[in-house]
């Protein structure tokens, strides 16, 4: 049995397959996901798993160079935004490199999410709890 943080085989495989600059979207239960896009659907019920708990586990295995958020999260979900930014700042310290943070309007976020290599759907049911993580290289 694997002893690293991600036990879900499909999610582990997606993370392992990411190359430099590939995007991985982690989203709430409501973000539209095209049928042709690879989706790791972890949603069990409302709130399980949460967006932040899923993000926390993914960040243990992914080297991140930048992230993308919807601008609307600042007003509609500031608590989630603040906790997410704290996690990203902690990760940047661990990685020894700054992580670029970019905001776009939600309609642009959805278009960019459609270009991600895969989407991880959580059971989160709060507004704009979505992020695109762009893979970096640890060397």
UniProtKB/Swiss-Prot annotation:
Disulfide-linked positions: none
Coiled-coil ranges from the UniProt annotation: none
Pfam family, one: RbsD_FucU
Top EC group: isomerase
Location in or out of the cell: Cytoplasm
Gene Ontology CC annotations of this record: cytosol
Catalytically driven reaction(s): beta-D-ribopyranose = beta-D-ribofuranose
EC number: 5.4.99.62
InterPro entries per record: D-ribose_pyranase (IPR023064), RbsD-like_sf (IPR023750), RbsD_FucU (IPR007721)
Molecular-function annotations in GO: D-ribose pyranase activity; intramolecular lyase activity; monosaccharide binding
Keyword entries, A-Z: Carbohydrate metabolism, Cytoplasm, Isomerase
Annotated function: Catalyzes the interconversion of beta-pyran and beta-furan forms of D-ribose.
Assembly and binders: Homodecamer.
Similarity section: Belongs to the RbsD / FucU family. RbsD subfamily.
Protein name according to UniProt: D-ribose pyranase
């Amino acid at each position: 049995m694997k002893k690293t943080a991600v036990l879900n085989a499909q999610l582990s495989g997606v993370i392992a397959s990411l190359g430099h600059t590939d995007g991985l979207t982690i989203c709430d239960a409501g973000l539209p996901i095209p049928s042709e896009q690879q989706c790791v659907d972890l949603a069990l019920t409302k709130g399980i798993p949460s967006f932040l708990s899923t993000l926390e586990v993914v960040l243990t295995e992914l080297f991140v160079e930048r992230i993308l958020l919807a601008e609307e999260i600042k007003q509609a979900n500031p608590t989630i935004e603040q906790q997410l930014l704290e996690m990203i700042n902690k990760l940047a310290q661990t990685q020894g490199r700054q992580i670029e943070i970019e905001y776009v309007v939600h309609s642009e976020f959805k278009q960019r999410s459609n270009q991600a290599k895969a989407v991880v759907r959580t059971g989160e049911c709060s507004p704009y709890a979505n992020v695109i993580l762009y893979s970096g290289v640890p060397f």
